[in-house]
């Protein structure tokens, strides 16, 4: 528990909340009459307001990307390895904004928020939101912060999809787009994994049609299973083999179905247990649907190059060799389309054994490449 923070940490940070009273029309046909977005900022906005960077989070992410909320925090924000003084997203240079998206469960308006029309939690009645909806809400946050143009919009996985959508929805408001371990749309296999996770939640007896909060329960087993399935896809076979192999928790097998015998079983159960205690089941459903629905080329006759025709940003696309959830082939597909659209794009394929989660890990080669790109951004 740090009492003196590392020299390259942003230190103590305090979340802020922006309230929006203007209705937000959503892709599903519904609207949110009012909503809150919780966010954090790191660094200082320069006089020209030209150094702002937006961080977009992935499925289970949130606004707390860097620093500490108190001296007693055991861990910093989820992307602390990349945000801070002298780090790839250098807070001595950039003013960084990180938010929790609509539908989240960490302070922004979402399923666990109170529906003003009923006085009860929204639950499953919270509208389905899309990546495009998120970007529209993020643009309103930029307006509140008086940021006309982002120096960069950055995200990994689902966050990378949001960064890409920014260049489509608001082409004149983003100068650099960094899409890391991402894809222009999900594959059938990815959609299938998301559906298995959703069914684990939806069929949990404690889900109660999404109204579990009113009953004072949570669909713990469903959330655990959803997280366990998801977590397997975030790791590579090599990294799991190196970390666990066929190691046992004890010296002998129990020959039953209830004991936790293999180390990898113990790890997955721990991950599921921990996740089910901090994440909202309805939010998980929403996030997976946002992933499934992201397909911007569908509005351009499935022509990915035409999709980015109006983009003015420079692009940096990064992938990891052992990521099979968002494979390098999907990033190369994106790069090919951007090149066909005659956009300024660089592509980095990083040799890393950690799988999809590599974008969250301080891998030296990754941090160096990331930092080199960010250092070249002029303000």
Swiss-Prot record:
GO terms for cellular component: cytoplasm. Pfam families: Abhydrolase_1 (PF00561). Keywords: Acyltransferase, Amino-acid biosynthesis, Cytoplasm, Methionine biosynthesis, Transferase. The active site is at 157 (nucleophile), 323, 356. InterPro entries: AB_hydrolase_1, AB_hydrolase_fold, HAT_MetX-like. The record marks 325 as: Important for acyl-CoA specificity. Its EC number is 2.3.1.46. Pathway: Amino-acid biosynthesis; L-methionine biosynthesis via de novo pathway; O-succinyl-L-homoserine from L-homoserine: step 1/1. Transmembrane segments: none annotated. The keyword Acyltransferase applies. SUPFAM superfamilies: alpha/beta-Hydrolases. It comes from the Bacteria. Its main location: cytoplasm. GO terms for molecular function: homoserine O-acetyltransferase activity; homoserine O-succinyltransferase activity. It catalyses: L-homoserine + succinyl-CoA = O-succinyl-L-homoserine + CoA. Transfers a succinyl group from succinyl-CoA to L-homoserine, forming succinyl-L-homoserine. Belongs to the AB hydrolase superfamily. MetX family. HAMAP family: MetX_acyltransf. Homodimer. This is Homoserine O-succinyltransferase. It comes from Pseudomonas syringae pv. tomato (strain ATCC BAA-871 / DC3000).
